[in-house]
Amino acid sequence: MKITINQASEFVGKEVTIGAWLANKRSSGKIAFLQLRDGTGFMQGVVVKAEVGDDMFASAKALTQETSLYVTGTINEDTRSPFGYEMAVSGVEVISESHDYPITPKEHGTEFLMDHRHLWLRSNRQHAIMKIRNEIIRASYEFFNKEGFLKIDPPILTGSAPEGTTELFHTKYFEEDAFLSQSGQLYMEAAAMAFGKVFSFGPTFRAEKSKTRRHLIEFWMIEPEMAFYKLEDSLQVQENYVAYLVKAVLDNCRLELDRLGRDVSHLEKMVAPFPRITYTEAIERLHELGFDDIVWGDDFGAPHETAIADSFEKPVFITHYPKAIKPFYMPEDPENNQVVLCADMIAPEGYGEIIGGSERIHDLETLQARMEDFDLDQEAYSWYLDLARYGSVPHSGFGLGLERTVAWISGTEHVRETIPFPRLLNRLYP
């Protein structure tokens, strides 16, 4: 019977066949240990010379890394095994031999591994990170479906920049100019006026010349928008959502977290509500900590975000940023017109901002005035202004960066490992 590795617990004591790749091997005298992987997990196959004979034992010892094969044998439960189960191998059929596999068990540099990303994905570590990424995506859909949100797919090609920035990838759309989307937010606002609560999940593109461990050129975002929601309503959705993601990974990816050496004691504290401080309070806190390189009105850099987050054991919301450093669609605070009704969620342990969100302006005249302040072409945004012309309501939304969230929850140092094929400032291959 053919099974997959993740089904091994159902076939203890039975002879089965598994299609797999040879991730690694070692031998000790008259026993060979084959580390097998099949995409669903990893398992050790044990080949005993006295049980299989000289010829098969010699063949097993000669197998090369990443050779594909069918392995037949009996599944045994073994608590000493890192995977919980082993196979007592009785037969091996080679499907395709692998010669001179470039990623050997020795240490390799980052550039070498990135050049071979298509092969690096096969490693134990990358398998664990991608499983956690998948769980976060799965749990995101589950959370928003449970909360009554409708999934909407905004366009990737747009005729304007949602945040009025210049960090865009330009292309031709027949005879017109077009851009790769930085965010689906404006389209999601339109959808919220039709369906109430909506969310999207898709790729976004930022032509930022940044080489930090937090930045990718192409990354994925979850972007919900909610009609009749004020800022505090949105913050409650955000903290419940992030707590839900962490719990899902703890419940369903404990083996992967262990494999990555993640200290789960940090994650077990991620229960809503999360702390909130204003931007002004954050600036004051930084000054108390000795940071003299930032004044009110500046945006935070990575060291500032890390210092603020270090004061808390959970993600922290920084609210009410200066109007001058935030996009045009964020409304002023009625009690202080120098700040806007917005918040960023900063993850602990130095992972930085994972969510940015705000209330949205729903008054037409106010929106037009803000667009003038930002020197935006109102004709290009005519459809967006229609939302305020025809029955708009108070509404809020946010965007969660998937790769940063995966990096934080998995304890991965650099976001380049949290997406299958990362696009970085100087990397478009493979």
Curated annotation (Swiss-Prot):
Cytoplasm among keywords: yes
InterPro entries in UniProt: Aa-tRNA-synt_II, aa-tRNA-synth_II, aa-tRNA-synth_II/BPL/LPL, Asn-tRNA-ligase, Asp/Asn-tRNA-synth_IIb, NA-bd_OB-fold, NA-bd_OB_tRNA
A GO molecular function held by the record: catalytic activity, acting on a protein
Subcellular location(s) per record: Cytoplasm
Gene Ontology biological process terms in this record: asparaginyl-tRNA aminoacylation
The keyword Cytoplasm is assigned to this record: yes
Covalent S-S links between cysteines: none
Signal peptide: none
CDD domains cross-referenced by the UniProt entry: AsnRS_cyto_like_N (cd04323), AsxRS_core (cd00776)
Enzyme Commission designation: 6.1.1.22
Catalyzed reaction equations: tRNA(Asn) + L-asparagine + ATP = L-asparaginyl-tRNA(Asn) + AMP + diphosphate + H(+)
GO CC term (a single one): cytoplasm
SUPFAM superfamilies for this protein: Class II aaRS and biotin synthetases, Nucleic acid-binding proteins
Keywords: Aminoacyl-tRNA synthetase, ATP-binding, Cytoplasm, Ligase, Nucleotide-binding, Protein biosynthesis
Protein family per UniProt: Belongs to the class-II aminoacyl-tRNA synthetase family.
Subunit relationships: Homodimer.
NCBIfam families: asnS, PRK03932.1, PRK05159.1
UniProt protein name: Asparagine--tRNA ligase
Organism: Listeria welshimeri serovar 6b (strain ATCC 35897 / DSM 20650 / CCUG 15529 / CIP 8149 / NCTC 11857 / SLCC 5334 / V8)
